[in-house]
Amino acid sequence: MAIKKITIVGAGRVGEATAQFLVKNELCRELVLLDAQEGVAQGAALDIQQSAPLFDFDARVTGSTNYELIADSDLVVITAGKPRKPGMSRSDVLDSNLPIITDIMNNVMRFAPQSLVMIVTNPVDVLTYHAWRHCGWDRARVFGQAGVLDSARMASFIAGETGLSVKDISAMVLGGHGDTMLPLIRYTTISGIPLTHFLDQQVIEKIIERTRHGGFEILRLRQTSSAYDAPAAAIAGMVDAIRHNRKRILPCVAILQGEYGENEVAMGVPSVLGGDGLERIVELPLTEEEQEQFKHSVEAIRTDLAHLARA
């Protein structure tokens, strides 16, 4: 699929930052920012459009509350929803964000039925599954952003501890986007060299815990807002892989249909991202301990899915 038009639903901090990344990196020709609150998307779009001469991009940016403008979108990125507050988990916002995603998907199905859909709204694992079940589309077309961000956070922490270039660090995080995520140390390297060659286990464990709580750390420090620059950069990285059909292996929230021994659940797993969306899931060999941790992450998501079923 040639990505020409992208819609971002939700013109909050993540949505606006994502729009900036996309146009500055020339990842679309037309971008629509949509928000339920009148004036928010329009103002953000106008601000971004006026930076075009300074950043030298030609994309046309439009803000609106009208879903009719999303017609012919190749990709819809959903960032809308109630944000977390200090002390809240990602699951705590499920009740508020479930009807928001349902309404958005109804409009996407009506006005952009040919599009790919990327879910960013938390809890992203549960809401990705809900969006997929609600629309009934092929799983390649509905996926979530989480693992790219979590892996980037882990890589940045590793760079800080080792003093080495983050460009040479390859980190891999599986599982849910939260406390049960599974940073895979065996698959984390620096220029192909295992991480354990550079750091002892105590430091690695500290990095793992900091990665698991990376979003909360920012929320605790800022108080009034959660992370938005790094999530937006992660979204842009995924869009780049799709737009340019790069066939990159990135950790994405994908619908599992037998992979890793699981069905009917959305989880963060290594996936091939290309022009057709999430084209393939890569199954990594896991140790017995890693399998147990992965299963624990699945069970945590299934708990939220059971709550969703009762909603």
UniProtKB/Swiss-Prot annotation:
Q: What is its EC number?
A: 1.1.1.37
Q: Name one GO molecular function term.
A: L-lactate dehydrogenase activity
Catalytic residues, chain numbering: H177 (proton acceptor)
Enzymatic reactions: (S)-malate + NAD(+) = oxaloacetate + NADH + H(+)
Q: What class of enzyme is it?
A: oxidoreductase
Asked if the record carries the keyword NAD, the reply is yes
**What protein does this entry describe?**
Malate dehydrogenase
Q: Which organism is it from?
A: Nitrosococcus oceani (strain ATCC 19707 / BCRC 17464 / JCM 30415 / NCIMB 11848 / C-107)
**Gene name linked to the record:** mdh
